[in-house]
Amino acid sequence: MESTLRRTYPHHTWHLVNEGDSGAFVYRLTGHGPELYAKIAPRTPENSAFHLDGEADRLDWLARHGISVPRVVERGADDTTAWLVTEAVPGAAASEEWPEDERAAVVDAIAEMARTLHELPVSECPFDRRLDVTGEARHNVREGLVDLDDLQEEPAGWTGDQLLAELDLTRPEKEDLVVCHGDLCPNNVLLDPETHRITGLIDVGRLRLATCHADLALAARELAIDEDPWFGPAYAERFLERYGAHHVDQEKMAFYQLLDEFF
């Protein structure tokens, strides 16, 4: 399929951006017309975030609701493979090493984007990610799809069964639903380097109805961890304050950070 798609864009140079464990490939296409991105993945992927037809539906839905996202150029599938081609969104990822005097503005922009997304009309969102997502977690443990060597610090060294037991123990009784990105990490938020205004959201394949904590937990964790030392715990706290600290339940935050270990 990749060779066929390359023939559709013969004047572009293809640059491999990412090769995922689930068999998905991401390419950046340059050199002719607007810069494009092409995703190629199994038609029925192990990772739900690489269900490309679903991601295309989400991109179209977000665009209709005023959210800046990549424009879908082409989507399709054959018996075994799916593909999605989109226009690149201008801007720099919020995860980049911003100058110290700009970092607060970057974090504030992520919080503003989260609020904007969470204020979209729930009744109009056809994508659902309620607590039954724990069923997907169990499936991933059974099928050996959870990378137990890449767990965060607190559950490091746990078995899949231990993770599931903790998930059951800490599962919230109810959810207040909003429209969630599903993977609201700084690298999926793009900003204008000059104004620090949001230019777009990318990698929206996990966008669904869920509690706001599903997004807040991942964004705060990524801002706090040492892998991006130009941010850190103080900026994670700033993000939550800017979003609205009165909305934040630390137990739910911990649950959704744990849930992410399964995906």
Curated annotation (Swiss-Prot):
Molecular function GO terms recorded:
ATP binding; kanamycin kinase activity
An example GO biological process term is: response to antibiotic
N-terminal signal peptide: none
- Give the EC number(s) listed in the UniProt record: 2.7.1.95
> Which InterPro entries has this protein been placed in?
AGP_Transferase, Aminoglycoside_PTrfase, Kan/Strep_kinase, Kinase-like_dom_sf
Q: Which residues form the active site?
A: D183
Q: Which reaction does it catalyse?
A: kanamycin A + ATP = kanamycin 3'-phosphate + ADP + H(+)
Keywords of this entry: Antibiotic resistance, ATP-binding, Kinase, Nucleotide-binding, Transferase
- Name the job this protein performs: Resistance to kanamycin and structurally-related aminoglycosides, including amikacin.
Instruction: Tell me which PANTHER family the record gives.
Output: 3'-PHOSPHOTRANSFERASE, PUTATIVE-RELATED, AMINOGLYCOSIDE PHOSPHOTRANSFERASE-RELATED-RELATED
The family line of this record is: Belongs to the aminoglycoside phosphotransferase family.
Tell me the protein's name.
Aminoglycoside 3'-phosphotransferase
